[in-house]
């Protein structure tokens, strides 16, 4: 080691008085290692070395030596000469303690660093290395194999989103990084990246107690992750903790269908139960006992993992173990022959990747015993073998595209409200939906019994094993758990189905699908004792999300206020420093303060507007749980317990009007009490009278009871409290009633009031509303050229089409409730502000001087928007022969953004006319140098043809 480096080392040892100071020294040395400026190097050296000369940065070679003593990379040391290699074995006692320093360096890297520090020419070469190579690897980086690197983007719960969790930086101390990851886990226990970093940090310190504690916490969230179980087993086995290893096997083997994990178990079993060589004696009880233990272990493994296509090596090892069995005597030879034939016949019936090799071995084995009996046995098993070999090709087509991430992640459509816009990323949404659909198609294929198995027990074991594999990688997808429970119900294993739903609720604590399904299953099997706790737990989860989102909003508003106060204080300080502190603020300064106040209010309004859809959506989610809770109790226990739940719900600060309506309708239809129902609506009107959607529902209820006097009184009472643009749904609902059941005087009065409220609305629109009934409309499509919103020859066909598009079919491009509301709101705005025209019509009704024509919306409800047919989408993303692969992902994302065709009710254009318009448009397509006739619709237009 050079003299300069030795002096730096001695000075550093003197400065090691606390762990915090050690971390600061490490951070400074890291800065020096990546090549900061000479001034920064001098400051860092002054902090780390109190005895260094003032000109420590003048000597570049000395700096390189000092840096290499701590941070030189192992790859750069390969360029050192033979002298450096000879010094690599120098004792490490003269190096400073690594505790609190760069803790991810291995012993080999430390040895290479020591060797490199003794070779000055090599250090000069190392100084020219790229910064990314010279910087030590941070603790948080996981060393993944190729398959893990392919799926590593799926580890983070918000991977690929704009709302990434906070990441550590290289200047953080070890304790700071640990606190950061612990905080991330506290916020989101399913943050796999944070878990892996914490475990890696504990292992780097060789703290077995901390590592065990972290693994125990980790496996409560990720109980089926084979890679982490294997890492845990390797760690315990490296310390010869055999009791701990066996305890881990008891925890994970039965619930983790991983071939690698079971191979590890068999390897461990053979290690602790070594099969002694044969002594040649007639009987060797110890060896016979060991052999029985090993064969029992293989039978145990094959019972759980033998259906996996990658378990072929376990089958071949088991066959080899039986072949090596010593058998003396006729009955023992016969037993060995029967056992071997039985294992062969089981193996060739499973679609294994090495099934052809096993079949050839079986063929040779049978022919080696007796060629006459071989034909009989081979002919019996040949159909099963041919079926398995054929199914193997289909199995590969279904299973090869399946995504198997390093750790399961939470899908974007089930993330919490705190995720913000991350759950609205269409590209990520589509990608994860395709991955889930691929697994679901594979599971459906397994349920279809492609092997034509006659043994029901074997078929059921194979399907349930497939579902277990699916939950290994899609643990946080409620759909998989639900489908597994439905399959178990279909084969009359109801109790096991309930267990799957319970496990699914633990994995997906906020899943409405699983909680509702569990309550439904409990009701079906007359076991409802724990269903109330299921509803209460789901309510607590949703309410906690609402409170957290509201707290985040208040924190954001407080931060904005603090920033504004800080700006004001800085302005006051500036004026005081300029000598204007006692002088009145001039007009220009007051104007700046006024504008700053306006900007502050705008910023607050933006934050509130951004949070409102999330909070309102969560409140509606809470309302749905309350409603389903009431319905469940009414069916199982009667109306009184349901009323008790309603009493609890209306006292909640997060209750919405839907809960009141559900209770009122329940009283009306189940208790046959219209008076109580009306009182519930009136109670809700006091709180939600400003909600036009609730008013419309109340009107519907009164009209359905034929209580026209109260309905008219309600309409007159509330219509004046709404602005015209907000009152549109109420006007439309009352107009629909008057058009159908009112007299001519009432209709004329209503038309006059509508004309006063909406003076720009065309008369033709109101006439269409008066002349139509539900979805029967002839004036619009036949006389005015307005295409019908719903296609179909009859009302029945239109109803079927509406149910197909707006129903609850599965599909990756089904719109969320929030997006539906956004589309509805935009449509409502279009009713009052958009332009409405038919082909050939002028921009005003009746010619010049008339009011502008508005966009027309039908009274009948449009179906839910869907960009594609759901069934077709599910098929194209899941099957082995993908029919949509020709479309780039960006095109699919754009197509997904397009609204449904049924939402369009304006004028229809011919595609040929649009293409001709595009062809003749003067659109610049090139840069300035190439701009000309070809770029403005000249010769360049030929490329459209």
Swiss-Prot record:
Segments annotated as HAT repeats: 172-204, 206-238, 240-271, 289-324, 335-368, 416-448, 458-490, 602-635, 672-704, 706-740
Iron-sulfur as UniProt keyword: no
Domain of life: Eukaryota
Cystines in this chain: none
Pfam families: Suf (PF05843)
Main location: nucleus
Region (Disordered): 1-24, 36-171, 568-590, 801-868
Annotated InterPro entries: HAT, Rna14-like, Suf, TPR-like_helical_dom_sf
Record's compositionally biased regions (Basic and acidic residues): 1-13, 801-824
Coiled-coil region(s): none
Compositional bias ranges of the Polar residues kind: 120-136, 150-164
Biological role: Component of the cleavage factor IA (CFIA) complex, which is involved in the endonucleolytic cleavage during polyadenylation-dependent pre-mRNA 3'-end formation.
Name listed for the protein in its UniProt record: mRNA 3'-end-processing protein RNA14
Biological classification of the source: Eukaryota, Fungi, Dikarya, Basidiomycota, Ustilaginomycotina
């Amino acid at each position: 080691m050079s003299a300069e480096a030795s002096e730096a080392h001695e000075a550093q040892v003197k400065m090691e008085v606390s762990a915090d100071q050690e971390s600061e020294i490490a951070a400074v040395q890291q800065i020096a290692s990546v090549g900061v400026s000479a001034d920064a190097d001098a400051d860092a050296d002054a902090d780390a070395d109190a005895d260094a000369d003032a000109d420590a940065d003048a000597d570049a070679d000395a700096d390189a030596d000092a840096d290499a003593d701590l941070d030189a990379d192992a790859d750069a040391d390969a360029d050192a000469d033979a002298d450096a290699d000879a010094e690599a074995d120098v004792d490490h006692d003269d190096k400073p303690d690594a505790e609190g320093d760069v803790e991810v360096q291995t012993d080999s890297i430390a040895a290479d660093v020591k060797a490199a520090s003794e070779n000055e020419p090599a250090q000069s070469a190392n100084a020219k290395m790229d910064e990314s190579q010279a910087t030590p690897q941070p603790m948080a980086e996981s060393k993944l194999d190729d398959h893990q690197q392919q799926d590593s983007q799926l580890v983070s719960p918000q991977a690929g989103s704009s709302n990434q969790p906070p990441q550590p930086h290289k200047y953080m101390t070890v304790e700071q990084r640990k606190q950061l990851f612990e905080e991330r886990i506290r916020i989101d226990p399913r943050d796999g990246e944070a878990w892996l970093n914490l475990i890696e940090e504990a292992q780097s310190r060789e703290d077995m107690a901390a590592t065990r504690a972290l693994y125990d916490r980790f496996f409560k969230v990720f109980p089926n992750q084979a890679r982490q179980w294997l890492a845990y087993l390797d760690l315990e086995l490296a310390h010869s903790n055999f009791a701990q290893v066996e305890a881990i096997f008891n925890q994970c083997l039965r619930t983790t269908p991983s071939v690698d994990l079971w191979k590890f178990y068999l390897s461990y079993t053979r290690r602790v139960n070594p099969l002694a060589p044969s002594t040649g004696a007639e009987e060797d009880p110890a060896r016979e006992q060991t052999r029985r233990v090993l064969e029992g272990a293989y039978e145990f493994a094959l019972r759980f993992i033998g259906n996996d296509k990658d378990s072929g090596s376990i089958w071949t090892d088991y066959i080899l173990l039986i072949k090596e069995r010593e058998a003396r005597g006729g009955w023992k030879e016969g037993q060995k022959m029967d056992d071997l034939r039985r294992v062969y016949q089981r193996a060739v019936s499973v679609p294994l990747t090495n099934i052809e090799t096993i079949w050839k071995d079986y063929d040779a084995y049978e022919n080696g015993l007796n060629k006459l009996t071989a034909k009989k046995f081979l002919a019996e098993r040949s159909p099963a073998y041919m079926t398995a070999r054929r199914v193997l090709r289909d199995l590969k087509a279904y299973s090869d595209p399946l995504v198997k991430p390093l750790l399961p992640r939470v899908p974007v459509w089930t993330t919490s409200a705190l995720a913000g816009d991350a759950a609205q990323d269409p590209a990520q949404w589509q990608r994860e939906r395709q991955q889930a659909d691929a697994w679901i198609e594979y599971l459906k294929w397994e349920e279809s019994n492609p092997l034509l198995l006659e043994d029901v027990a074997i078929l059921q074991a194979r399907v349930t094993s497939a579902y277990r594999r699916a939950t290994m990688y899609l643990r946080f997808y409620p759909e998989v758990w639900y489908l597994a429970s439905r399959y178990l119900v279909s084969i009359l294993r109801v109790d096991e189905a309930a267990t799957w739903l319970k496990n699914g609720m633990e994995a997906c604590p906020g899943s409405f699908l699983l909680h509702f399904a569990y309550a439904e299953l409990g009701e079906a099997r007359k076991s409802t004792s724990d269903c109330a706790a299921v509803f209460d737990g789901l309510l607590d989860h949703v309410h906690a999300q609402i409170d957290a989102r509201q707290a985040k909003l208040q924190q954001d508003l407080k931060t904005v206020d603090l920033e504004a106060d800080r700006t004001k204080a800085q302005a006051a300080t500036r004026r005081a420093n300029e000598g204007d502190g006692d002088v009145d603020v001039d007009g220009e300064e007051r104007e700046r303060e006024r504008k700053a106040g306006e900007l502050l209010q705008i910023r607050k309004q933006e934050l509130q507007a951004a949070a409102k859809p999330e909070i309102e959506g969560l409140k509606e989610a809470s309302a749905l749980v309350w409603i389903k809770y009431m319905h469940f109790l009414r069916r199982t226990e009667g109306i009184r317990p349901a009323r008790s739940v309603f009493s609890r719900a209306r006292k909640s600060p997060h209750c919405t009007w839907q809960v009141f309506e559900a209770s009122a309708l329940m009283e009306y239809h189940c208790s046959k009490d219209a008076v109580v129902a009306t009182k519930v609506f009136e109670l809700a009107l006091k709180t939600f009278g400003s909600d036009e959607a609730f008013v419309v529902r109340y009107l519907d209820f009164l009209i359905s009871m034929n209580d026209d006097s109260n309905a008219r009184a309600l309409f007159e009472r509330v219509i004046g409290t709404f602005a015209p643009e907000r009152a549109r749904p109420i006007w439309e609902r009352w107009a629909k009633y008057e058009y159908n059941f009112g007299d001519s005087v009432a209709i004329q009065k209503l038309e006059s009031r509508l004309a006063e409220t909406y003076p720009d609305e065309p008369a033709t629109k109101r006439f269409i509303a008066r002349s139509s009934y539900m979805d029967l409309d002839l004036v619009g499509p036949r006389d005015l050229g307005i295409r019908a919103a719903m296609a179909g020859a009859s009302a029945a066909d239109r109803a079927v089409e509406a149910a197909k598009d707006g129903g609850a079919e599965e599909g990756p491009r089904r719109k969320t409730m929030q997006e539906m509301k956004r589309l509805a709101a935009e449509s409502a705005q279009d009713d009052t502000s958009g332009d409405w025209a038919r082909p050939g019509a002028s921009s005003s009704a009746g010619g010049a001087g008339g009011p502008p024509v508005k966009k027309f919306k039908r009274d009948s409800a449009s179906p839910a928007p869907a960009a594609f047919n759901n069934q077709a989408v599910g098929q194209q993303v899941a099957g082995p022969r993908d029919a949509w692969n020709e479309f780039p992902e960006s095109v699919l994302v754009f197509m997904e953004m397009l609204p449904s065709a049924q939402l369009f009710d304006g004028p229809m254009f011919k595609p040929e006319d649009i293409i001709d318009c595009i062809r003749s448009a003067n659109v610049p397509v090139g840069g300035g140098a190439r701009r000309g006739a070809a770029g403005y619709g000249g010769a360049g237009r030929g490329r459209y043809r």
